Amino acid sequence: MSTTFCSSVSMQATSLAATTRISFQKPGLVSRTNLSFNLRRSIPTRLSVSCAAKPETVEKVSKIVKKQLSLKDDQKVVAETKFADLGADSLDTVEIVMGLEEEFDIEMAEEKAQKIATVEEAAELIEELVQAKK
């Protein structure tokens, strides 16, 4: 049994507004009085759970990214580093994903692989896929 510790949980709420019209009519009268008011209530729209990847996974991903992008050894690549900030284009990102798949013996679905923008996101997806293989 494995335990996952999450680093953050956030919930975003949006307001839903609705306008309601009520008409009152007194018996025997032809005219109407209209009232209009807004009902507001918060409805949670999205619950986001972000679990930090293991430091060793982040380190491996960082090394692969540096290798695939031919970065210097002293180039800092941390969990929050975006591939685009390192000069990676879409082809570079495909090569990074291929390197990660080979290193971790996994296969990433194309739609998930396209959403990876940072080292942390790659590490989290890798851990998810490795866990699913077990």
UniProtKB/Swiss-Prot annotation:
Range annotated as the organelle transit peptide: 1-51
Q: Which tissues express it? A: Seed.
Report the superkingdom from the record. Eukaryota
Residues forming coiled coils: none
Q: Does the keyword Translocase apply?
A: no
Where it mainly occurs, coarsely classed, is plastid
User: Per its UniProt record, what Pfam families does this chain match?
Assistant: PP-binding
Q: How is it modified after translation?
A: 4'-phosphopantetheine is transferred from CoA to a specific serine of apo-ACP by acpS. This modification is essential for activity because fatty acids are bound in thioester linkage to the sulfhydryl of the prosthetic group.
Q: Gene3D superfamilies from the entry? A: ACP-like
- Give the record's GO CC terms: chloroplast
Recite the UniProt keywords alphabetically: Chloroplast, Fatty acid biosynthesis, Fatty acid metabolism, Lipid biosynthesis, Lipid metabolism, Phosphopantetheine, Phosphoprotein, Plastid, Transit peptide
Listed PANTHER family: ACYL CARRIER PROTEIN, ACYL CARRIER PROTEIN 1, CHLOROPLASTIC
Family assignment? Belongs to the acyl carrier protein (ACP) family.
What does this chain do? Carrier of the growing fatty acid chain in fatty acid biosynthesis.
Other information: In rape seeds ACP is coded by two multigene families. There are probably a total of 35 genes.
- NCBIfam families, sorted: acyl_carrier, PRK00982.1-2
Protein name, entry field: Acyl carrier protein, chloroplastic
Q: Species name for this entry?
A: Brassica napus
